[in-house]
Amino acid sequence: MRKKITLACKTCGNRNYTTMKSSASAAERLEVKKYCSTCNSHTAHLETK
């Protein structure tokens, strides 16, 4: 089953993106580099619940 997760900026903490993640195959938290409009640059975004 796929879970809906939120991605938050590591620098400012702003929750910018939502995505789906397979709960069975990925146990660790997701971290991707995406654009943050608050920081006005590409930063690391971490998975939140």
UniProtKB/Swiss-Prot annotation:
A GO molecular-function annotation: structural constituent of ribosome
Keyword Ribosomal protein: yes
Deleted gene: phenotype: No effect on sporulation at 37 degrees Celsius, however sporulation decreases at 47 degrees Celsius.
Gene Ontology CC: cytoplasm; ribonucleoprotein complex; ribosome
Biological process per Gene Ontology, one example term: response to antibiotic
Pfam families found in the cross-reference section: Ribosomal_L33
Record-linked NCBIfam families: PRK00504.1 (NF001764), PRK00595.1 (NF001860), rpmG_bact (TIGR01023)
Biological role stated in the UniProt entry: Plays a role in sporulation at high temperatures.
Family: Belongs to the bacterial ribosomal protein bL33 family.
Name under which the protein is recorded: Large ribosomal subunit protein bL33B
Organism: Bacillus subtilis (strain 168)
Gene of this entry: rpmGB
